[in-house]
């Protein structure tokens, strides 16, 4: 997505110092070099996981670097406090590209101040049509909370189909029935790739915006929601695997 944005010229990476954060940093640098060699990496920080209570020093570094974009795999308090610090510092000219900005606590931290500035990549967004829309609304009505983990819908859809195909509830038979399975879900066709049991599915780029008539379901009662701005078909979103899975005999 970023390769098609000429305004992206200087990117700052800030991630959590554990395997996932290290991978986000590694692959962001590799992909930017391959897709947009002109983009300059102006910072690459790894912060201790769930220990930083004030991200103001990191925001000061981002501001000083001249970055126009930030890529972060942060989640939980490490994302909420990062965005809060950016809002508090008035960092209005920098876009944040995230993975987990819809997870509990982050939308409240985003608030109105982050509208138009925070993007998220994921397999879902809050305002799908069809059966999942009713589930999301029902969950909100019953628990006053957001049902943002659409993978639950995938899981039960696939498990139901696998039981029927296997004509059994034996785990080995059900797992075998899942291999290579394709099914229609809320975000298009989803496939359980046989080689590594990873779901192949479409991905959305969404942007934090004020909820409206077209996208009425907000996040954490903020009056804002993640609005899809780009969709990638599964064959585009899919990446190769080197997995050599050992299956039970």
Predicted segments — roles?
Residues 1-89, 124-134:
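Extracellular/periplasmic Venus flytrap/periplasmic-binding protein
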Residues 11, 117-120, 139:
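Structural signal for hydrophobic
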Residues 16, 101, 123, 210:
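Cofactor-binding loop segments of dinucleotide-utilizing enzymes, especially the Rossmann-like FAD-
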Residues 47-50, 91-115, 128, 175-184:
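Venus flytrap/periplasmic-binding-protein-like
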Residues 73-76, 98-103, 121-122:
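Beta->alpha turn/N-cap motifs
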Residues 182, 186-249:
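Solvent-exposed, acidic/polar segments of extracytosolic/periplasmic ligand-binding ectodomains
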């Amino acid at each position: 997505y970023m390769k098609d944005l000429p305004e992206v010229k200087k990117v700052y990476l800030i991630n959590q110092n554990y395997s996932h954060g290290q991978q986000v940093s590694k692959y962001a640098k590799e992909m930017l070099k391959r897709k947009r060699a002109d983009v300059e990496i102006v910072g690459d920080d790894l912060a201790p996981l769930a220990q930083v209570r004030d991200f103001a020093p990191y925001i000061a570094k981002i501001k000083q670097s001249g970055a126009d974009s930030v890529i972060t795999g942060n989640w939980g308090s490490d994302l909420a406090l990062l965005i809060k610090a950016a809002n508090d510092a008035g960092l209005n000219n920098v876009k944040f590209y995230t993975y987990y900005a819809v997870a509990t606590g982050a939308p409240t931290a985003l608030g109105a101040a982050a509208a138009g500035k925070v993007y998220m990549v994921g397999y879902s967004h809050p305002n799908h049509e069809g059966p999942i829309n009713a589930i999301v609304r029902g969950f909100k009505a019953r628990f006053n909370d957001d049902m943002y983990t659409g993978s639950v819908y995938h899981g039960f859809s696939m498990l139901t189909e696998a039981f029927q195909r296997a004509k059994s509830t034996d785990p080995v038979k059900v797992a075998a029935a899942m291999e290579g399975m394709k099914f229609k879900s809320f975000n298009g066709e989803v496939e359980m790739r046989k080689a590594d049991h990873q779901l192949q599915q479409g991905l959305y780029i969404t942007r934090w915006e004020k909820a409206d008539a077209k996208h009425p379901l907000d996040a954490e009662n903020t009056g804002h929601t993640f609005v899809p701005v780009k969709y990638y078909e599964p064959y585009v979103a899919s990446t190769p695997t080197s997995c050599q899975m050992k299956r039970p005999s």
